[in-house]
Design a protein with these regions (language model features):
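The beta1-alpha1 cofactor-binding region of Rossmann-like NAD(H)/NADP(H)-dependent oxidoreductases
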Residues: 17-29, 64, 184
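Short, small-residue-biased leader/transition segments that mark boundaries at the very start
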Residues: 1-4
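Conserved mid-core segment of classical short-chain dehydrogenase/reductases
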Residues: 50-68, 87, 91-97, 117-120, ...
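C-terminal helical subdomain
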Residues: 148, 170-191
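Residue(s) in the substrate-gating loop at a strand-loop-helix junction
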Residues: 108
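Alpha-helical segment proximal to the catalytic Tyr-Lys
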Residues: 87, 137-138
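Active-site helix of classical SDR
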Residues: 82, 124, 132
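Catalytic Tyr-X3-Lys loop
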Residues: 49, 60-80, 104, 128
Length: 191
């Protein structure tokens, strides 16, 4: 199907759906964005996958293919999107403070405080945190600002797949408020 979907928010925003781990898919989404707007001002990287898998569980060793795909989507995919978007942002006319674009990556509290079974997810999100500063230094010369947000536990489609047995202890571990975050709160933080 078509990798590009559109939802009008205020006439000046849109989003593109792509397989972030595939260069051609991301480039197609970028091209569609350029067709509509003529430039890219902001990218919000939110792609992420993961589920619990112990290093050694009752079925044996953690599947290596699973570990690799989590890193492919969460870490390599984040890098793939930002590097291709940065090419286009570098063509923008500088605005206030000579800024040509903004990239916001999504990590996770798991980058700093991973739980049992989160080796792949935590490693991928720690990688997002770890690459942010060197990339910010690299892209700063082009007027591109890059930041990473490491949210706690949010009520996303990925979390919705978890059983109540998994969700309940996670909610109990939160400090305040005693609930999962909602996507609207994250959107307000990012914007």
């Amino acid at each position: 199907g078509d990798v590009y979907k559109r939802q009008e928010l205020d006439g000046e925003t849109d989003y593109a759906v792509a397989n972030v781990a595939e260069e051609a898919s991301v480039q197609k989404a970028i091209n569609k964005t350029l067709e509509k707007f003529g430039k890219i001002d902001i990218v919000l990287n939110c792609a992420g996958i993961g589920s619990a898998s112990k290093t050694v569980g009752k079925d044996g060793a953690h599947p290596l293919d699973y570990f690799k795909i989590v890193l492919d989507v969460n870490l390599v995919g984040t890098f793939n999107v930002l590097r291709l978007a940065a090419v286009e942002m570098g063509k923008n006319e500088p605005e206030k403070d000579n800024e040509c674009g903004v990239i916001i990556n999504t990590a996770s509290v798991a980058a700093y405080d991973g739980q049992i079974g989160q080796a792949a997810y935590s490693a991928s999100k720690a990688g997002v945190v770890g690459m942010t500063l060197p990339i910010a230094r690299d892209l700063g010369r082009m007027g591109i600002r890059i930041n990473t947000i490491a949210p706690g536990i949010f009520d996303t489609p990925m979390m919705a797949m978890a059983s109540d047995e998994v969700r309940k202890p996670l909610i109990e571990m939160t400090q305040f408020p005693k609930r999962l975050g909602n996507p609207e709160e994250y959107a307000l933080l990012a914007m």
